[in-house]
Amino acid sequence: MFRRNLITSAILLMAPLAFSAQSLAESLTVEQRLELLEKALRETQSELKKYKDEEKKKYTPATVNRSVSTNDQGYAANPFPTSSAAKPDAVLVKNEEKNASETGSIYSSMTLKDFSKFVKDEIGFSYNGYYRSGWGTASHGSPKSWAIGSLGRFGNEYSGWFDLQLKQRVYNENGKRVDAVVMMDGNVGQQYSTGWFGDNAGGENFMQFSDMYVTTKGFLPFAPEADFWVGKHGAPKIEIQILDWKTQRTDAAAGVGLENWKVGPGKIDIALVREDVDDYDRSLQNKQQINTNTIDLRYKDIPLWDKATLMVSGRYVTANESASEKDNQDNNGYYDWKDTWMFGTSLTQKFDKGGFNEFSFLVANNSIASNFGRYAGASPFTTFNGRYYGDHTGGTAVRLTSQGEAYIGDHFIVANAIVYSFGNDIYSYETGAHSDFESIRAVVRPAYIWDQYNQTGVELGYFTQQNKDANSNKFNESGYKTTLFHTFKVNTSMLTSRPEIRFYATYIKALENELDGFTFGDNKDDQFAVGAQAEIWW
């Protein structure tokens, strides 16, 4: 716009000169014409420079405050940025046209960050994602992960998980908005150089569309501010990040739901979703598909005191079985489906110096309770690796969790994840029906903060679990892990800032392995590993 104004002014200044030159053309020689044109050009250049200086003074934003060295005459020694100069703090943007009665500049200052956000909002498209990848080697051949869900992730994971989300706004008028959302997730193998999907050596390379739905605002008169969605989408997940499993997880093949519905002091999330399961027979060789539906209800963000909020949640899963499916269960050895539920509460406390801690209490029965009893990963699934089986007899399990991070002074930060669980008369995937279990797992991750970009610390993990089967036989599983690490970061938070690059050395030992019989390479019960890993989200 500024350049067009300069060009227009130049044309206006040249126009009368051109007219005068035309009227005198017949009486002037060529030399005289050139002399007049050169004089007019010098005058025009002088006028343009004067106009440019005035405009520069008038519209330079007050928020831009960079120190510029000057010479003895007071002129800037280098008033124009070079290719190596830092990017400006702000840009000039033209405001909407002012009325005749309004005064002031038609330009205003906007930071580059705000300008970038404005452009993104105007386009209505966003691309978000997550992935991790890295290299590692171990003392007994290829490095192996063990009990990540109990001992912690640092120096104990060798997968290349990713999530990629595409979101496009397709309508935003009259207080109504519609967005299309697609998410892909999966894993890229970290063992072989080839990672073709479908050529799934070692079960490493896979991908799925985990989300494909439409979300809206403003279409429900009783909840205009809420997000109303339809399609393949589950309820929001809540993760214990250090242990890499979820306390709240409701997957979906398809569903309908409402999120962030303001009711009273808090907000309601509600989802009705379909998630069919493969019901197996007792040989675990034959299966049948059973249609199941889940209702997930949460009342969240309930204020308690300063920086503290409460959530109350409930989930119920039921089957819609055909007559032939029930007949297979009654007469052909297929496991009976049993409805399952989970309910609980969680409290989140944020701290004045940064950081937070989340405490949760959850109770479940039947197949969800069975997953409470898993030491490796304990997300509240209704199946085991996608397979529904087991004699579920109404047994229950309880889980108490704590996770978070806290700053200690200016140079120390500590993250934690502590879980205590027990269950009675549940089906255990290791010890069978009518099992009892009790477990505790604890991981602490203290670190020294050198600066915003560097931390050095240690992750210490320990767990122990005992199962008792129907005959009162006891089975124990336990182990510990020590990981020394140094991380390159972009902020000091351990749990909420990424990207992060870590260098680690890990010693991990299985003290007891009566539940899974796990061993590391060379049939050893321990492993020393070193490596580097990158983790990023955007």
UniProtKB/Swiss-Prot annotation:
Which N-terminal residues, if any, form the signal peptide?
Answer: 1-25
Which residue stretches belong to region Disordered?
A: 52-82
Q: Where in or outside the cell is it found?
A: Cell outer membrane
Origin, by domain of life? Bacteria
Residue spans making up a coiled coil are none
- Provide the membrane topology annotation: Multi-pass membrane protein
Cross-referenced Pfam families: LamB, Sugarporin_N
Q: What is its main location?
A: membrane
Q: Where is the composition biased (Polar residues)?
A: 62-73
**Record's keyword terms, sorted:** Cell outer membrane, Ion transport, Membrane, Porin, Signal, Transmembrane, Transmembrane beta strand, Transport
Q: Which GO terms describe its molecular function?
A: carbohydrate transmembrane transporter activity; porin activity
For this protein, the record's InterPro entries field holds: G_neg_Bact_CarbUptk_Porin, LamB-type_porin_N_dom, Porin_LamB, Porin_LamB_sf
One of its GO biological process terms is: polysaccharide transport
List cellular component terms (GO): cell outer membrane; pore complex
Q: Which SUPFAM superfamilies match?
A: Porins (SSF56935)
What does it do? Answer: May be a sugar porin with a broad carbohydrate specificity.
Similarity annotation: Belongs to the porin LamB (TC 1.B.3) family.
Query: Which named protein is this?
Result: Putative outer membrane porin BglH
